[in-house]
Design a protein with these regions (language model features):
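Pocket-flanking alpha-helical
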Residues: 53-58, 63-79
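Small-molecule-sensing regulatory modules
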Residues: 2-45, 71-82, 87-93, 101-285
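Active-site-flanking structural segment that lines cofactor/substrate pockets
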Residues: 39-57
């Protein structure tokens, strides 16, 4: 039987969070130190640990079938690669920034200026869209130093917390691209591996859905059931179960975590007691 080939970042936060989501999906990966290729013991999956910037090329050449990479890299190097699922972690942005003391306040003022970046393709598309002509200096690392050494008037680089910009006396003037980790696939994936991808996506979506919801249980007066269930923005109809005391019932439902805080006071005002919120491990809808 064929195995689906997954490319992951060799190290770093994206690597760690990618392995964590596989673990949450029940897929066992035992990686030894310095191993660049491992197989799952309970799912037809091979994992390749590669340099992040090389992964789009491996996908396009069909060396690997799927990968977890950031949208920033996909936008820069991954034209033609298929995005299958947004994963909700490793969030960042690609932004334009200038020195704090610069008179440049908006992107139109970058006309005829010089910009240092590790994302030349992303920057070129943005400048073309806004009809800005600027000189682009391509740098593979430490982009933020470029204005301080007189190489560029501005930088275009990845921003996470903003601390690197702050430490280099830079300020953001425009976000070009918002990014998070995505599961993506080769445009040439074969039919058998595409089916394995669907099985993996089913598991991943169950894990991602569970993060957004909580299981809500409460006791309520039987004569307040209609009013209380009407307050619950949960999935379909809540489960209502009788208790030993016939004047009380137990209400069970699934609710978005953020929505719960909007209704908890109303639930209590209408007689709900013993309210419990439980995490959900997986959820398939």
């Amino acid at each position: 039987m064929k195995k689906i080939r997954l490319a992951l970042q060799k190290s770093g936060r994206l690597h760690d969070e990618s392995l964590q989501i596989l673990n949450n999906c029940g897929i066992e990966i035992q990686k030894g130190q310095n191993q660049l290729k491992v197989s799952s013991s309970n799912f037809p999956l091979e994992v390749f640990f590669l340099r992040n910037s090389d992964i789009p090329g491996y996908l396009l050449d069909n060396v690997v079938d799927i990968a977890v990479i950031g949208e920033n890299l996909l936008h820069e190097k991954g034209e033609g690669i298929v995005v299958n699922e947004h994963l909700g972690f490793s969030k960042c942005r690609v932004s334009l920034a200038v020195p704090n003391q610069s008179n440049i306040e908006n992107v139109s003022e970058l006309q005829s200026k010089s910009i240092a970046t590790s994302y030349p393709n992303t920057l070129k598309k943005f400048l073309k869209k806004h009809q800005i002509k600027a000189k682009i200096h391509v740098i593979n690392g430490s982009v933020e130093i470029a204005p301080n050494i007189g190489l560029a008037n501005a930088v275009c680089d990845i921003v996470s917390s903003g601390s690197t910009l702050f430490n280099n006396n830079l300020k953001e003037i425009k976000t070009i691209l918002k990014s998070e980790a995505v599961l993506c696939s080769s445009p040439s994936i074969d039919e058998q591996r595409a089916e394995l991808l669907n099985q993996l996506l089913f598991r991943i979506r169950g894990v991602l859905s569970a993060k957004k919801f909580k299981y809500l249980l409460m006791n309520a007066p039987a004569d307040k059931v209609d009013r209380i269930t009407g307050l619950l923005p949960g999935m379909k109809s809540p489960t209502v179960m009788p208790l030993a005391d016939k004047s009380w019932v137990s209400i069970h439902t699934v609710i978005e975590t953020d929505e719960f805080w909007n209704v908890i006071d109303l639930l209590k005002e209408n007689g709900a007691q013993g309210i419990l919120i439980c995490p959900i491990d997986k959820m398939f809808v």
